[in-house]
Amino acid sequence: APHGACQTSGTLRSMSGSMAESLLGSDHSKAAFLEFGTGTHSPQGHYPLHSFHPPTEGPYGGSGYGGRTLGYPYSPHGHPQHHASPYLPYHQGQHGGSLGHGGSRLDEDTELEKNTVIENGEIRINGKGKKIRKPRTIYSSVQLQALNQRFQQTQYLALPERAELAAHLGLTQTQVKIWFQNKRSKYKKIMKQGSSIQEGEHLHSSASMSPCSPNIPPHWDSPMGTKGGPIGHGSYINNYGPWYQPHHQDSMPRPQMM
């Protein structure tokens, strides 16, 4: 009798242990299933409930072991479906990034327009700008005549003289100042060209006074001389006739007279 009681008590202990393990395994699978279900948007019906089988089998059956191994949910294809869900926010992030870049370009254009300021006839973008060309001032013949006469008197005007001349001609002081600056630059350019022309004429006149004519090339520079061929007497006379007058022409008729 005691032996049978010990055997029944051992069986009850093993059954209670297997039931506790199956219950703990089912609790773990439930917790994992709930955590996975809240983290993803996929319906819960896709996951088979293998871990919720009642512990009808023996103490060493597959229920307790299966409850532990199948604590995590799985898809019927063998791969967890939570890998497909992260791609959606990634693509959304890409589209959002492209939209963000477009918005930033528009913001840059608006900021560029805001920073573009025209100050004193200059376009300034962030403090750096290019000058705007102002329209050229068209002077009348009377104004040009008066300005030229005053320039012949003096090339530089003092401030009171410039103000007086501008008021007399109906111009601004800036217009008078710019006209005198341009006139001085043109005058200096003409004087420089004139001095270079005079120097060239002086060199030409000094070369023409030399005994050798600059228009006639020397004998070794002539094309016939470079070839090395004989130079005829007639061609030599024709080329150097104005500078060479042979004396044998006077002696040639004398033998004929004899």
Swiss-Prot record:
Its main location: nucleus. Residues 132-191 bind DNA. The keyword Lipid biosynthesis does not apply. CDD domains: homeodomain. The keyword Transport does not apply. Gene3D superfamilies: Homeodomain-like. SUPFAM superfamilies: Homeodomain-like. Residues 194-228 are annotated as: Disordered. Keywords: Developmental protein, DNA-binding, Homeobox, Nucleus. InterPro entries: Distal-less_Homeobox_TF, HD, HD_metazoa, Homeobox_CS, Homeodomain-like_sf, HTH_motif. It is found in: Nucleus. GO terms for biological process: cell differentiation. It holds the Pfam family Homeodomain. Expressed in regeneration blastemas. Detected in forelimbs, hindlimbs, the tail, flank, and brain as well as in limb and tail blastemas. It comes from the Eukaryota. GO terms for cellular component: nucleus. One of its GO terms (molecular function) is DNA-binding transcription factor activity, RNA polymerase II-specific. Belongs to the distal-less homeobox family. This is Homeobox protein box-5. It comes from Notophthalmus viridescens (Eastern newt).
